[in-house]
Every structure is written in C-alpha cells, then in structure tokens.
Amino acid sequence: MTLNGWFQVLLFCGIVFALVKPLGFYMARVFNGERTLLSPVLAPVERGLYALAGTSEREEQHWTTYAFSMLLFNLFGFALLYALMRFQAVMPYNPQAMPAVGPELSFNTAVSFVTNTNWQNYGGESTLSYLTQMSGLTVQNFVSAATGMAIAIGLIRAFSRASGKAIGNFWVDMVRSTLYVLLPLCIVLTLVYVWLGVPQTLGPYITAQTLEGAQQTIAVGPVASQLAIKMLGTNGGGFFNANSAHPFENPDAISNMIQMVSIFAIGAAFTNVFGRMVGNQRQGWAILAAMGVLFIAGVAVTYWAEAAGNPLMHGFGLAGGNMEGKEVRFGVALSSLFAVITTAASCGAVNAMHGSFTALGGLVPLINMQLGEVIVGGVGAGFYGILLFIVIAIFVAGLMVGRTPEYLGKKIEAKEMKMAVLAILCLPLAMLAFTATATVLPSAVASIGTAGPHGFSEILYAYTSAAANNGSAFGGLTGNTTWYNITLGFGMLMGRFLVIIPALAIAGSLVTKKTVPASAGTFPTDGPLFVGLLVGTILIVGGLTFLPALALGPVAEHLVMAAGQLF
C-alpha cells in the first residue's frame, strides 16, 4: 500500500461526501413535488406523461396498488426486451448483422436488465445490435434504476407521514426519478465521456490494419450514452465484454474517478433525502456513517490483500502487488477501490477481473454482496435494503431495554419484523440453495474454469451476484449454458422482487400508524451508539449466514495459498 493509493481513496470519499447534501437537497425537492431549477423545462413534459398514462400527481396509491403497478411495468419491460433480442436479426441499426439471441440467453439477459442486475453471459460487441443496446438495455438501465428509487421513496414516506393510507404513486415517482434526476445527469455525463474519448456513433465497426499488416476489427458504437446510465443507475452492464477495463469504456484515471463517483452519488444522497423528508438530517448522517464504516473496512482489507500480492509469486523473486487481471493505467489501488465500490453498490461494473484477485481480495466483494449491498447500495435499492436492517436493529434494541421498539415515532411491531426478516432471508436462500445444487450437478460443475476452492468460489460468486442484483462475476465460470441462464435468472428475480414486496408491505403498515412523540426512554437513532448497533446487526444478521460457504471458498483458498499448495 502507498500514500498515493490512500490519497486516491480519500479523494473519492471526499467528492462523494461533498455531493451528498446538494444532491440530496435537489432530490428531496423533486420527490416532494416542489419547484426546481429544471421545472420550467421539465414540468410540461411531466404533466404530458401523466396525461398519457391516465394518472395524476395528486392521485396516490395503497401499497398493494403501488406494488402491482411496479410488477406490471417490469413485466412489460421484460417482454419488450426479450422480444427485441429474439427478433434482433430483422431489426434496423444492426450494421454488423448480429443474429437473433437464443431463448435461454434472451431470458437471462432480459431478467438481468429488468432487475438492475446486468449479469452478462455474452459479449456485448459480439452479440447485440446497436438497437438492442440502445432501445433495450439502455432504456432498462433507466427504468430499473427509477424503479429502485421509487420503492425507496415510498418506504421513506411511510416514516415521514404522521398517518395515512397511501405511500405515493409509483408512476409519478418513477417519472420524476427518470426525468428530473437520471436523465439530466446522464446527458452531462455522456458529453463528458465523449470529451474524454469514449465512442458515441451509429457507424459500423472500424477495420484497421495493424503494424504487422493484418486486419483488425475495432468495435465502436453508442457507448458513452450507455456508459453514463450504466454507472449512475448502478446497472453495471458494459457495452464491451471487458466492461470498464476496456479503454473505450474507461479511457483514463479521470473517467475512472467519474465512474466511481457516479456509482455512489445517488445512493449516498438518499441518506440526505431521508433526513430531509423525516425532518431530521442527523438521521441520514447516522445511516451514512454506518455505511462509511463498512465501506472503509472493505477497502482497507482489499487494498492490503492486493498490494501484498501472492506469496507463491514472491518465492520466484516477483515482489510487488497482485497485478494479474488489472489494467496498468489504474494499478492496484484504483482496481481495489473500484471492486469494493461496485459490490458495495449493486453496480457490478468492473475495471479489473475479480476472479484474478487474491483469495482475501476477492472475499470482500463477495461479502459486500452477501450483506445485501446496503453499503450505499444501488440507487434506491441500497437504501430500502438498509432500512430493513434498521427495522431489525431497532427491534433488537427495544427487546434489550424492554420497550416497544420505535423508529422516528413509528412503532416497530411483529408485522414489520416478519416482513424485514422475510426480505433478508430470501437472499441466502437464493444464493446458497442454487450454489449447493450446482455443485452436485455434473453439467453445472463442467462450467467451472478452475480447480480447488476457487472453483467453488466461482459458483458461489455467480449466484451471490445474481441474487444481490450485482452482475459482476469471477470470470472463470462459463455461464452461457441452459442451467446457468435459467437458474441465475430465477436468482435475480428472487433477489429483486422478494425484497421489494416485503419492503412495500412494511411501508403500507407503517404509513397507517400515528407518530408517537419521543420520550426520555426513546432509543436515540442519530448518534454513534445507533451506528454501532446498525453495523453489528448488518454483520451478524446479514453476514454470519454465509460463513460456512465462505470457509469452503475464499478462506480455504487463502489457507491453501499460504501453505504453498497449488491447484
């Protein structure tokens, strides 16, 4: 580890921290329906969209109607994207004459982008046409991110409203998320990326002659526009197979820093949105502090492990950090930081190959996802995820002091606790059940690219990434098979909607409750004691479940490596 490396980590943290308050202020005004700087331009468009949809910003929904609207919208998006890939060969904007995508891969990809996972069992530049990339994947990048933001806002309203029956309007929340937050920021980011050298063209791939006289095809396309929402919406699916390790998708250190900040910007700002909407910004800062503790710990372990390198290589006189699978233009520090960021959020974009990390270096991204990606997390998804852990933490605190648990004046009772536990338990169910099944099926084991404990880690990482709606992978696993396309697809659906529905049920229950005034016995939720309780709850409830599986994978791999054994 070097001072320069830690300076880059601190620079990233400083930029994100500086954006939390202004972006949170703007987003709070957007979701409260207040006037913003963009209102003169966007308000007429917003009203026009409501008129076309047959709804109104004054029309609010019960949580069940909110959930039904969300499910219906996502089902339509899945069907449209699936059809687009299946009929890709006869559609326009296909200069490379890409054939139709197979049914299993189309199912997996459609589920992947609808759930904001962006798991990719294909190479974008060798499989998909420009139309599919733009009208299919990029559109879903916007609306899947907006869906997560809408769910988070609905849950926040349940805490902020004194009493009522409705949690908002899904269509209004989604339109505002897209129109006022995602779209303006992405327009700016797209222009910046083009300025930095990222391609943005509808022209065909370029054929170039190499120095040896051979012909080389250079893939280009509408990359910058997809890249902007890919990072800002914590989607992660790359235009190119190499994702953000590709020089056309991440040219230099400046673009790399912008991409890392984009991943965390909205998720971190949601803590400030929460504080503003509940009338106490200290509540939001406390949640951000808990996220920060877990994030810095993860960065420290990953950076240390990668900087220390592989002791087996040191025996050959090759000192230095682990540079396998990393880009020289980023080095160990920025590669380690990017890996922790992309798995702390539900992004999944990579600027280095996680499968080439050391055992402990790869352990941290795995744990980040298994915790439910609540360390900032995906746009919206990370925040409603950590609110589920807050419900459990407050319930435990109430039991310890013998009082009815309360959070922000709302009583946390049996129904809220059951729904929170249900949402949290669906993740290990999807991650571990599919992993266990895959390890005993010869056809699934045949896809493993590495022997020993790392081979098990490849399977565990795949299903963890799918259920956590992350999308990154240990690259040694061949995922484009019928088994993995179907089971990973179901894992993504479970990890997305079996968390969202209980979260909305909690919102529907809490919004009907009257706010109880704070008293001398009320547990303070804006100080260091609450931060410690929340961190402990996340680690114990969210992480302890996976300890046996981790012991068989990365922990065993580290011990084998330390013993000097190869596999």
From Swiss-Prot:
The chain crosses the membrane at residues 5-25, 65-85, 136-156, 179-199, 254-274, 285-305, 330-350, 352-372, 375-395, 421-441, 486-506, 529-549. Coiled coil: none annotated. Disulfide bonds: none annotated. It comes from the Bacteria. GO terms for molecular function: P-type potassium transmembrane transporter activity; potassium ion binding. One of its GO terms (cellular component) is plasma membrane. Pfam families: KdpA. Keywords: Cell inner membrane, Cell membrane, Ion transport, Membrane, Potassium, Potassium transport, Transmembrane, Transmembrane helix, Transport. The keyword Lipid metabolism does not apply. The keyword Ion transport applies. InterPro entries: KdpA (IPR004623). It is a multi-pass membrane protein. It is found in: Cell inner membrane. Signal peptide: none annotated. Part of the high-affinity ATP-driven potassium transport (or Kdp) system, which catalyzes the hydrolysis of ATP coupled with the electrogenic transport of potassium into the cytoplasm. This subunit binds the periplasmic potassium ions and delivers the ions to the membrane domain of KdpB through an intramembrane tunnel. Belongs to the KdpA family. The system is composed of three essential subunits: KdpA, KdpB and KdpC. This is Potassium-transporting ATPase potassium-binding subunit. The gene is kdpA.
